[in-house]
Amino acid sequence: LPDDAISIHNLSKKFKNPDGKGFFYALDNVSLSIPRGSIFGLLGPNGAGKSTFINILAGLTIKTSGEAVVWGNNIDQHPKASRSSLGVVPQELTIDPFFTPKESLEQQAGLYGVRPKDRNIDYILRMLDLEDKAEAYSRTLSGGMRRRLLVAKAMVHRPPILILDEPTAGVDIELRVQLWKYVRKLNENGTTIILTTHYLEEAEELCDKIAILDKGKIVKSASKQDLLEDADSKTISVKVRETPDLNHPILLELGANINDNNELTVNFNPKIINSREIL
């Protein structure tokens, strides 16, 4: 088995500007590795490039340049094998209201070419607590159940990697926590999870490693622990008219120093004191 579920090297995707003049990069020279068996968070605001990243991996968008390897398969050299290694759960609740969950999964399994004797539909329904609703019309399911049905459809061909695109966007806290439980359950059963989100709380709660994407570039990629430690340390610089006494107890505690341009720099923990209080 590969050490990395997904390995990305210098991946770029450019699109034409809406006015037809010139181009913009939705992804700009992105490189990252997603460890096998991890819950990996791709964090960023709307328009950061998260959906473009997913669409390239899923074969829905053609990259401009770079390399992407999914479960040991290069997406250019082995497109079918790489796509079959992925299950993608879209943000939109797209279900057929006239199909039951069991019928939906049977249909999805057929589309993936899974033979009837190899289908594990009852197991998936049971794992996602949809067994009692297996024969109910999908239109009668609650919002949380519909989300879980989308997860079930993505897992029907037993992919080793599951991508969840903004799975809790627009849902309440109770439903969000409920979905987190199922994500952990899937991961404990061996599935590598890739979670795109703009909720810092969600990434902090679930993920082992987090990459922050903004304007098509990776701003930071590190373990959750390293990112949280970075968040505990901030620096502020201000230009002062008069040189302060650096031996003052508060300035000593903040590790203050001053340069030749009379710029005073202090380090602080934003959980203890904020920049306004310092100023």
Question: Where are the model-predicted features located?
Answer:
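Conserved catalytic motifs of ABC-family nucleotide-binding domains
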Residues: 158
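Conserved ABC ATPase signature
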Residues: 137-141
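Conserved ABC ATPase "signature" region
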Residues: 106, 110-133
